[in-house]
Amino acid sequence: MTGKVTTLDNGLRIVTDVMPHVETVTVGVWTDVGSRHETPAQNGLSHMLEHMAFKGTKKRNARDIAEVVENVGGYLNAYTSREHTTYYARLLKDDLPLGLNVLADILQHSVFEPAELERERGVIIQEIGQSNDTPDDIVFDYFQEAAYPDQPVGRPILGTVDLVNSFSRDDLAGYMSDHYKAEQMVVVASGNFDQDSFVQQVEQEFAGLSRARDIKTDPAVYHGGLEKQQRDLEQVNLLIGFEGITFDDPDFYAAQIMSMVLGGGMSSRLFQEVREKRGLVYSIYSFMQSYVDGGSFAIHAGTGEEQVAELIPVVADEMHKLSASVSSEEVNRARAQMKAGLLMSLESTTSRMEQLGRQMMIFGRPIPHAEIIEKIDQVDAVAVMRYMDRMLSDNKLSVAAVGPLGALEDYDKIAARF
């Protein structure tokens, strides 16, 4: 997968990825702004803006925006992360001009009508409530807070009810004006379409975008710690993690392979030892989360109140074992899993759009899949053990727990096990 990059005079970048054998196309607009770019008083504003972009423009009301894409069988959506916000449409190939027009409209001509703002404020408050009532959801917010306390990257993407209630139309309009600039945005299309016609339409639709304003972002500084909440539940939802690495760290792929060996599937060490052998959990897995200037590694599990006392020592033991010994069979299996996942994703126009958009946001260029596969194949057992040892030696443990916590050890005792 290699997308062609075109840069317009105003700095807007366009990535075209033509797939002539398919009948669909996915077009996305990536903006280089997420919850980590917010001040404390703005926490949740990126997410609210993403919602409000669909609630009316100068020429379409909220219903029009929903119907115009669905009338042709298309799908329109968006999502906010800590570093980016993405708006996209998935359509039949002949409907690409319509989808692009709608995206350009909502990203440049939203009116933030007061009645719609009040209505959507209620929707987001319900979303926050749903997240708070879902232990295996809210525990991830607690983990971020433990890892990055009192920082934008450690705050919840949704914000708080009080802050959501405080946002005004002027707040939304000002935030969009500050951050939705040509040099901070990338338009990506993957699927069956005419490349020249698409680039020409993007140039026409986004001609009014101005160049970027210098927006400063606080660096992500990992600390570690414990965030917990006692709840009357059947299970303890638990996240245990360490400081991770950036996307461009030389150990990035070794870290991914390490995570796969430790907790990346039914054949992983944690699944086999914790679930299959001991029956302590239904689900357990590990994952890496990287940012442009940091990252984290974590293990998520759900277990009973009494079982948590056995679970944590077993997890610690498995991590120490992995730092001392990894078989070539395990590494080969993890590499195969990563490569298969990558190659399978290339059959989806939406997955390709997301990969290209993310690569442009992070690296400023599309990364050919052959280059990624080459880096995966370079990882050996020594690199995996070395990275695990590197991570454990820092020993900045982050712990988040929600549920019946009577048997949970205090932070220092947990940290000492690792």
What are these regions (language model features)?
Residues 1-10:
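Short, Gly/Pro- and small/polar-rich lid/capping loops
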Residues 13-16, 229, 238-240:
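Short hydrophobic-aromatic micro-motifs
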Residues 11, 18-69, 143, 180, ...:
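Active/ligand-binding-proximal structured segments within catalytic/core domains
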Residues 201, 233-241, 249:
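Acidic, glycine-rich loop-and-beta core segments that form the ion-binding/anion-interacting portion
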Residues 26-29, 238-241, 400:
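Active-site-flanking beta-strand signature of metal-NTP-handling nucleotidyl enzymes
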Residues 7, 18, 62-217, 228, ...:
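Charge-rich, well-structured scaffold segments of protease-associated domains
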Residues 224-225:
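Flexible, small-/acidic-enriched active-site or ligand-binding loops
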Residues 219, 235-238, 256:
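C-terminal non-catalytic interaction appendages of large macromolecular assemblies
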